[in-house]
């Protein structure tokens, strides 16, 4: 019996019919707190890693080795005043940052951390993740419009066009995973990657989706960078043009919510990439299967987040027309062609996804 089953059984005996509600709330709170801590130290890791790439130390003054820097940053933002522009639409202005961060948290309901460890093991988990993550576009448009500022609205329009453009390519990449796994359930998608010739010989990582679906994996991950408005796709908040884009009129904790949503979405994109293409909680080699699955998932997510940061430190920002061209003229045709290729592959005698 797993730890989760033990806690569940003990709680059911103790609290009776009220236990399912209490257990659901406890799990949601635990996941939310862990995500907030991950965001805090992801920001520190980003500053440290970019510092090393620039041949400097990065934050190292607050606490031993700078470990308390995230706490200082949070306190600074909490203590700053939220200044609302006079011409802004009051309630819409305040709702926008909340609408940005809520979907970022909500996606975690269906992401499995290891076998049987998921908040909601729904059969349409992949569809749910795609639908919920799309809501962030409305929050960005709302923030730009409610601020009643030309620069904020321009940034919001850029963000909306960019996010919608790359969602199409990302959607086709996920269709490929659906085709090969035959399921929208994320746990079953992970399970479908644990079979095949290489997995039978103990080399699990060669059975994961990243290899046969490599173009889709690359398109998905780069589209994820564009979806989160990260460098080199950050024309939404281009410092040399419109500064912070749709967030330009936000300050204090309202601005911090946008910042929080961006980093949570980075972790979500990495967690989904690890789940759909890198075997989720599966160990890369069979002889390492004794290590808990959540360790492998965290390691894969950390590696993908480090790639996010490496891309930021390495590449120059694209022009807006280059971003649109990449999305519509490169990624979309590549994913459509690969859908056809994989469809023919699955219908041929060389089908490697035979159930």
Curated annotation (Swiss-Prot):
The keyword Repeat does not apply. Its EC number is 7.1.1.-. It is a multi-pass membrane protein. One of its GO terms (molecular function) is NADH dehydrogenase activity. This is NADH-quinone oxidoreductase subunit H. InterPro entries: NADH_UbQ_OxRdtase_su1/FPO, NADH_UbQ_OxRdtase_su1_CS. GO terms for cellular component: plasma membrane. NDH-1 is composed of 14 different subunits. Subunits NuoA, H, J, K, L, M, N constitute the membrane sector of the complex. It catalyses: a quinone + NADH + 5 H(+)(in) = a quinol + NAD(+) + 4 H(+)(out).
